[in-house]
Amino acid sequence: MFDFDDSRLEDPAVLADASPLLRNLASSGARVRREAATAEAPLTALTDVDRPRAVIAYGPEARLLRAVLEPVCPVPFVAWPALGLPGWVGPLDVVLVIGRRGPESLAVAHEAVRRGARLIAVCPPDSQLALQAASRSTTLLPVGTGDPLAAAVVALVALNQLGLGPSTSPDAIAAAIDGL
């Protein structure tokens, strides 16, 4: 078990250390705000979407989203851990891919588009995922900071827009992170 030494908070030498971990934590709230602002315009495209039969989330934050949404989501929500998609996924479903790179995310997005599912891709706009997943049933939510928590917040806002999740305020989440 790690014991935290409170005296480190009063040691000027320790406080002067510009540790990348502390700097990263200190800017987390700003990254959430930035990603939410960047994705604001594409999120409006999600207001005219019918309620899906199910939501399948793929990516490193899929289990976090499932933990938040499972108690309140009115449709089945699956955090899919495997390559590919379940055999039943089709045009009545939403596939949410949160990814920066990698052949796994590309394969899942390609399969979702091929099957006619509504695809929501949370990724950098110039990524392979964004380029290869483009279709009329794809909504690209651009993220650029590489922060998985910020990407998860954008995904939560998108699912709220679809009426599948709780009201999500990126500013309130960012303020809570800033308070850490």
Indicate residue ranges for each PLM-predicted region.
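A short linear-motif detector with a strong N-terminal bias
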Residues: 10-12, 34-36, 58, 74-77
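N-terminal start-of-chain detector that recognizes signal peptides
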Residues: 3-5, 26-30, 67-70
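Glycine-rich phosphate-binding loops that contact phosphosugars or nucleotide phosphates
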Residues: 48-179
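Active-site phosphate/pyrophosphate-binding segments
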Residues: 12-24, 30, 34-45, 144-145, ...
